[in-house]
From Swiss-Prot:
One of its GO terms (cellular component) is recycling endosome membrane. The gene is SCAMP1. This is Secretory carrier-associated membrane protein 1. Functions in post-Golgi recycling pathways. Acts as a recycling carrier to the cell surface. One of its GO terms (biological process) is protein transport.
Length: 338
């Protein structure tokens, strides 16, 4: 009670046990109850310090972005462009064939009106001898066979040039070896003989076979061309005293003179090339022959028809028949008189 009698001007909390600093510190740390909650008080917690977050590696999203594809209309446009280009190409080819057929038709009309004039060999107008054959690949030969016929024509020319060079090769060999006069003479004979004969005997039948689809002419070509191939092989071999600068003759000439031997080796290589190309083209022509529908039966029919329609044969048969009839009538008349 003595405390109540103390100085009224003294601090009232001085002796208050609830104002003890240790007690107030504990009570301050206790969270306030619901009855002491004040919604208007500033109860925000202080912001946390700068906390370092762990580095998380970036991952791709769960939904992958689809790859970029060309839209469907682009593919359609490309296909349409390709189809249009193919159509244009076919149209150009058809127009080219139509123009070629038109040109051939006009040429055939001109030939029917003015007649077909021979144009091969191409000789000058003032030459005493005129052309002997008519040759025009674009007019006579179908388009699919023109290349083959032209190659055979160039092969004939190649062999003719080789025979011409063979003359000079044998002449050079004759100059270094006087005993080779026989080869030099035969080389001239082979050039004068084989050049026209090969043109008439196998090239013209081939030309006519493709022109008129003649089975008989195909068989004539095959028979003669086999012989021609054998000639090419013999010329490439070059036996002595046969008039050919083949491999055997070239080696002999090389032992006598190196320049002459080299010249003869070149000619032997040309003969060998002729033989190889001839074999290849024979197979090609035979393959084309099988696609044309030609046969041995058709060849027999064409031969029989050609023989019977030949004016010379008809005249000879008529003369033979008239002679036989006359002799028979005379014998019968003599028998009646006896």
């Amino acid at each position: 009670m003595s405390d109540f009698d103390s100085n009224p001007f003294a601090d009232p909390d001085l002796n208050n046990p609830f104002k003890d600093p240790s007690v107030t510190q504990v009570t301050r740390n206790v969270p306030p109850g619901l009855d002491e909650y004040n919604p208007f008080s500033d109860s925000r917690t202080p912001p946390p310090g700068n906390v370092k977050m762990p580095n998380v590696p970036s991952t791709q999203p769960a939904i992958m972005k689809p790859t970029e594809e060309h839209p469907a209309y682009t593919q359609i446009a490309k296909e349409h462009a390709l189809a249009q280009a193919e159509l244009l190409k076919r149209q150009e080819e058809l127009e080219r064939k139509a123009a070629e057929l038109d040109r051939r038709e006009r040429e055939m009309q001109n030939l029917s009106q003015h007649g077909r004039k021979n144009n091969w060999p191409p000789l000058p107008g003032n030459f005493p001898v005129g052309p002997c054959f008519y040759q025009d690949f674009s007019v006579d030969i179908p388009v699919e066979f023109q290349k083959t016929v032209k190659i055979m024509y160039y092969l004939w020319m190649f062999h003719a040039v080789t025979l011409f060079l063979n003359i000079f090769g044998c002449l050079a060999w004759f100059c270094v070896d006087p005993s080779r006069g026989v080869d030099f003479g035969l080389s001239i004979l082979w050039f004068l003989l084989f050049t026209p004969c090969s043109f008439v005997c196998w090239y013209r039948p081939l030309y006519g076979a493709f022109r008129s689809d003649s089975s008989f002419r195909f068989f004539v070509f095959f028979f003669v061309y086999i012989c021609q191939f054998a000639v090419h092989v013999l010329q490439a071999a070059g036996f002595h005293n046969w008039g050919n600068c083949g491999w055997i003759s070239s080696l002999t000439g090389l032992n006598q003179s190196i320049p002459v031997g080299i010249m003869m080796i070149i000619i032997a290589a040309l003969f060998t090339a002729s033989a190889v190309i001839s074999l290849v083209m024979f197979k090609k022509v035979h393959g084309l022959y099988r696609t044309t529908g030609a046969s041995f039966e058709k060849a027999q029919q064409e031969f029989a028809t050609g023989v019977m329609s030949n004016k010379t044969v008809q005249t000879a048969a008529a003369n033979a028949a008239s002679t036989a009839a006359t002799s028979a009538a005379q014998n019968a008349f003599k028998g009646n008189q006896i």
